[in-house]
């Protein structure tokens, strides 16, 4: 996408206005007519605390804005706000297309304005937020303003053990699509029972945002590492105005090269969308063939029952991994590709094969690089309410409070829908240290159902422990504590 004329990266220097409390914010702060001559400059992406605005706070499990007796969803009056502003240019040849503003990550509560009009709001800071902005922009110069509150109601679900800092943390960009375009797709790329032949399934949602019905066609090609086409398909469908239709493909491929940590073989999927015979867009994506299973082995435990193990491509797998946070002393939570690659190279040099995203989804590029390097990803929803602790009674953990079900579900769905097709995505996690209960029972069932016809990956949640809503339980922390607290020193 980045090489397309229908893509504009908005990273760089923006104008920035900061106040320690939202009460000190001028009423007309989003008016595009006001001067920004006395505003500061700020680098985007990059948290504002590492650029001289506000105070960075580190804490483990308390809410930094209400460390004692938290009362969700209430927030303090001394809630800092950062206002970002820059001009954007809408090319004339984007006219008649759908235009989107994409925020890859901003913390915490983000209000979006274009030319002074409110466009929308988002508060899931570690997932993408996307806004259709056709009716707010005109060809040529427009003014984009982001008003970001340091703390929002979403902060009650973002109580992770890391530096609590604020602002734009990932890329900001514009892109445009034809009215008749690809909306979403789902890739199944697993193996048959011989673990040699590949089972390839593709479902593509074609969307028509035009004013009249259109004949839409999806053509796909699957190419191996040498550029040879190993599978292809084409289907056409009539899509009414304002509607979405799905086309599906199913094919078995002999003797595929499998994807694993030891040999991360990738195929290239190229999807072409046509409208009335004319090419509208071309979308590439990497595909890896792997089969993920949890199943009994022939080896018996002391109780006479078979051991149950994790298998990849028919082989038992021992996970050797690390937790990873987004953190860099120069830019805060913004991680460049160069830094990501350094991390991955260190991991591979130390024979690691797994990375747990603690405790939120990472940037898209992170997953693409895991596909390339061969790392099993334990993806985790951006949910941790550790500051509420784990009491199942009313007023305790948010994980058992039905009033917070939608917030838990939205964050889980955001993670799943964005990341479901990456070959490295091996495990789903419902969150971390957020208690258990009704909300996590529901998110577990949702993910199991959503993934059952795609890759049927294990769904895990550490606070479930021995309850039914987790497919794996690995007491890693307690094991490390025991190992480090036995009073013996290794020589």
Please identify what each model-predicted range represents:
Residues 1-65, 143, 147, 151, ...:
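Accessory carbohydrate-binding/adhesion or oligomerization-edge regions at the termini
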Residues 94-98, 137-141, 253-268:
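Short glycine/proline/serine/threonine-rich loop/turn segments at secondary-structure transition edges
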Residues 112-114, 197-238, 245-249:
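Beta-strand-rich binding/interaction modules
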Residues 344-347, 354-491:
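Substrate-binding/catalytic cleft of secreted carbohydrate-active enzymes
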Residues 17-21, 47-55, 74-184, 209-210, ...:
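Accessory beta-strand-rich segments of carbohydrate-active enzymes
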Residues 81, 139-140, 197, 240-244:
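Solvent-exposed, conformationally flexible loop/turn segments
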Residues 4, 185-186, 272-347:
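N-terminal carbohydrate-binding accessory modules
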Residues 179-210, 301-306:
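Surface beta-strand/loop "capping" patches
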